[in-house]
Structures are given as structure tokens and as C-alpha cells.
């Protein structure tokens, strides 16, 4: 089921993402991005123009996505309600507890982060990252 959901969601996300966004996308790799950077630098030199790059390292990126913000983004980019509903159900009612050297905490609701290891997570992260830029 997740594979089907991912394929449908990816169709919409691909429409929203610019071509230069290569992370977690089929047929796009690091070498392509390095080549694009080299070409940009070369053209800037030819035209005697300055060029600036900004590289962002998203530390703990998958852990930081707020679910409520994600639902708003999905609505804003017009992801169909039936897909959004399936995603919301997937994330609904998640709870966790933390084990420390002093014992275990009580159970609490998880309101942030995408599911680790889930095939939907990179797609959801890309959409969120593009939205905040």
C-alpha cells in the first residue's frame, strides 16, 4: 500500500519541485549536481559575473518536520484530500516513550518527524524543504 501511495504522491510532488531539486529523486544524482555547479561557475567567469552558492545541511532533518505544518503544505499545493487523509491516518496516534539512565518516561504523542525508513519520508521532506525556501 505504501508503494502505491508513494507513486501517487510523487506525481504531485514532482510537479511542485523545480528541476534543480535533485535530492531523493529518481534519475538525479550527485554527479549531475556537481556538473551543474561547475557549469554555473564557468558561465559566471565567462560573463565576468559574481556567483553565490548556499549549501544547507539539514541536521536531524527528518525529525524536525511538524505534522500540522506538513498537512497545511499538502493542502496548499493541492495534494488531493484522499491522499492527505491516508497520510494523516498513517501518522495519527503515534506515541513514544524514552528510556534513560534514570528510568522510562511516560508515553507521549509524536507531533514531529517523518517515519524513519518509510518510502514516503523523502518525498514528504522534499516537499516541505521546497516550501520553506
What are these regions (language model features)?
Residues 1-132:
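Conserved pre-catalytic core of RNA-dependent polymerases
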Amino acid at each position: 500500500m505504501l508503494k502505491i501511495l508513494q507513486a501517487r504522491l510523487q506525481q504531485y510532488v514532482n510537479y511542485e519541485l523545480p528541476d534543480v531539486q535533485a535530492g531523493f529523486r529518481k534519475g538525479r544524482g550527485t554527479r549531475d549536481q556537481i556538473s551543474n555547479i561547475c557549469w554555473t561557475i564557468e558561465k559566471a567567469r565567462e560573463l565576468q559575473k559574481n556567483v553565490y552558492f548556499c549549501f544547507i545541511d539539514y541536521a536531524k532533518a527528518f525529525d524536525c518536520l511538524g505534522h500540522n505544518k506538513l498537512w497545511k503544505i499538502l493542502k496548499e499545493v493541492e495534494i488531493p484530500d484522499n491522499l492527505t487523509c491516508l497520510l494523516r491516518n498513517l501518522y495519527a496516534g503515534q506515541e513514544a516513550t524514552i528510556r534513560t539512565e534514570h528510568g522510562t518516561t511516560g508515553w507521549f504523542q509524536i507531533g514531529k518527524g517523518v517515519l524513519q525508513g518509510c518510502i514516503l519520508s523523502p518525498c514528504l521532506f522534499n516537499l516541505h524543504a521546497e516550501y520553506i525556501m
